[in-house]
Amino acid sequence: MSGPILIFDSGIGGLSILDEIRKVMPQQSCCYLFDNARLPYGELEESELISGCVSLIIEQAMRINAGIVVVACNSASTLVLTTLREQLSIPVVGVVPAIKPAAKISKRRHIGLLATPGTIKRPYTKQLIDAFAEDCRVELFGSSELVMLAEAKLAGTAVDMQKLELLLAPIRTSELDTLVLGCTHFPVLATEIKQSLGQSIILLDSGKAVADRVLSLLKGNGLPKTASNKVVDYSAVFTTDDIAQGLKKRLVEEGFTSIEPHSSTNLR
């Protein structure tokens, strides 16, 4: 049997990726690691993000003898995938903003990317747009505050619609017909975003594509096996800081049976 999937994000927005994975692999063991001590990632310096993420993910992957790592964070994926793939012997899957499918379906040839400021400014994002949406008008909208709104919603707090309306105001005045949710936190707010922008707008995220990629890898023959002497809770959550009771409740509802700290000297 291959080891559990290790899903990583700065917060619990990566649960949107986990949900898609469970749709296609309901019996697959998963562990979740989130670096809530440094949330939100979209405002971190690149050097800090890279050094912290790489050490954190590698340590936890080795600790649980993971069979595959999913970096369920756009901000991190744009920076750390190459290094992780060089240092880990297991597959590493990242999240790519759904620019390509958005360009294919936009009738107006006018799309938007809603992401963290970090993802918006990365050269990789521009490369995606140049490669797959050259014939489209692409508008970029960056927000870290939406990340915290999503975190609050997952903890059981009602979404502040007045604040959401203010944050989405630049999009509402645009004539785009397709909006890419380029942060794994943002699908959590999909209902509220549609309520604000109108039901006709098409929202796209990368969750299904990531799940399909993971399934494809698990069906292959190259995944390492867990050592027989390794014992791990296959439904564990690991955190880098304390979490609110509301978030703990949500994680239990997601089926996780233990929540414990990740101990590391390299987090800060």
Curated annotation (Swiss-Prot):
Substrate binds at residues 9-10, 41-42, 74-75, 184-185. Its EC number is 5.1.1.3. GO terms for molecular function: glutamate racemase activity. The active site is at 73 (proton donor/acceptor), 183 (proton donor/acceptor). Pathway: Cell wall biogenesis; peptidoglycan biosynthesis. Keywords: Cell shape, Cell wall biogenesis/degradation, Isomerase, Peptidoglycan synthesis. Gene3D superfamilies: 3.40.50.1860. It comes from the Bacteria. It catalyses: L-glutamate = D-glutamate. The keyword Isomerase applies. It holds the Pfam family Asp_Glu_race. GO terms for biological process: cell wall organization; peptidoglycan biosynthetic process; regulation of cell shape. Belongs to the aspartate/glutamate racemases family. Provides the (R)-glutamate required for cell wall biosynthesis. HAMAP family: Glu_racemase. This is Glutamate racemase. It comes from Shewanella piezotolerans (strain WP3 / JCM 13877). The gene is murI.
